[in-house]
Amino acid sequence: MAAPKESLWVRTQLGLPPLLLLTMALAGGSGTASAEAFDSVLGDTASCHRACQLTYPLHTYPKEEELYACQRGCRLFSICQFVDDGIDLNRTKLECESACTEAYSQSDEQYACHLGCQNQLPFAELRQEQLMSLMPKMHLLFPLTLVRSFWSDMMDSAQSFITSSWTFYLQADDGKIVIFQSKPEIQYAPHLEQESTNLRESSLSKMSYLQMRNSQAHRNFLEDGESDGFLRCLSLNSGWILTTTLVLSVMVLLWICCATVATAVEQYVPSEKLSICGDLEFMNEQKLNKYPASSLVVVRSKTEDHEEAGPLPTKVNLAHSEI
């Protein structure tokens, strides 16, 4: 216990980061209980440790420092991933390698630590994919089921306001009309109640026999139900299908109306243009005869000579005049 505490105190005096100190403390032989407590949070590094043992076997590398450096690189990567929330694994790898460079001064131990960071990367990616697969995903039919539930709730709330009643109109002897209105009441006949009890007893007696057959029938149903499962699903969930069909039909009708208005040809009737020879064309159409030149009488009026008016008086400037 003294050696890890002394090494931890030395690293603290040297100013190493707290993240690295935590890794070195967990990697020690006396911190197995603490390491197991952090495994559930930081992730499993056993596969990375086995890869380090295969890379640095003790019969080939008699020194244990490189093996421990590789295993600490695995743990460093897990801690960096926990700090960064696993957003970018490439960035986590760079942070792990920089921590290895700060922790080890010898090149062999630095390389072993970097190798541990590299070995932990594929296992971290696999763990991230597994966590993403466990996250709940929204089904494609979830919006339709949501609309169906909303529609059913709205219909139930609307039916709660609807009340049924009986109304009777009677006419008295004096001619007055009397109206009786009351809510319907359900009355059970005694012989029907007795029949219902008999049916209940007979149904209970048949349940034991039907349960044995249902177990076998249910097994056969599961085998044969795969073929008609889609049709059965449609028959059971026809409400939201009808609602969806109605909504889509309304949307298609609106789209057709808008498209027709936008692409319709303008109904423009051009006005008839006036022609200079319109009178002549009219005469030709009506087959009218022209008047001869001798039948035309030219009346000339004698123009009267008018004397021209005299010149206008000269302009007088009122500002220079005295009144």
Swiss-Prot record:
InterPro entries (alphabetical): Uncharacterised_TMEM59
GO cellular component, one term: plasma membrane
Membrane topology, as annotated: Single-pass type I membrane protein
Superkingdom field: Eukaryota
Intervals, Extracellular compartment: 36-238
Motif ATG16L1-binding motif, chain ranges: 263-281
Signal peptide start and end residues: 1-35
Annotated transmembrane regions: 239-259
Modified residues (Phosphothreonine): T303
Cytoplasmic topological segments: 260-323
PTM comment: N-glycosylated.
Subcellular location: Late endosome membrane; Lysosome membrane; Cell membrane; Golgi apparatus membrane
Covalent S-S links between cysteines: none
Main location: membrane
Notes on the domains: The ATG16L1-binding motif mediates interaction with ATG16L1 and promotes autophagy.
Family note: Belongs to the TMEM59 family.
Annotated function: Acts as a regulator of autophagy in response to S.aureus infection by promoting activation of LC3 (MAP1LC3A, MAP1LC3B or MAP1LC3C). Acts by interacting with ATG16L1, leading to promote a functional complex between LC3 and ATG16L1 and promoting LC3 lipidation and subsequent activation of autophagy. Modulates the O-glycosylation and complex N-glycosylation steps occurring during the Golgi maturation of several proteins such as APP, BACE1, SEAP or PRNP. Inhibits APP transport to the cell surface and further shedding.
Annotated protein name in UniProt: Transmembrane protein 59
Species whose genome carries this gene: Macaca fascicularis
Origin organism lineage: Eukaryota, Metazoa, Chordata, Craniata, Vertebrata
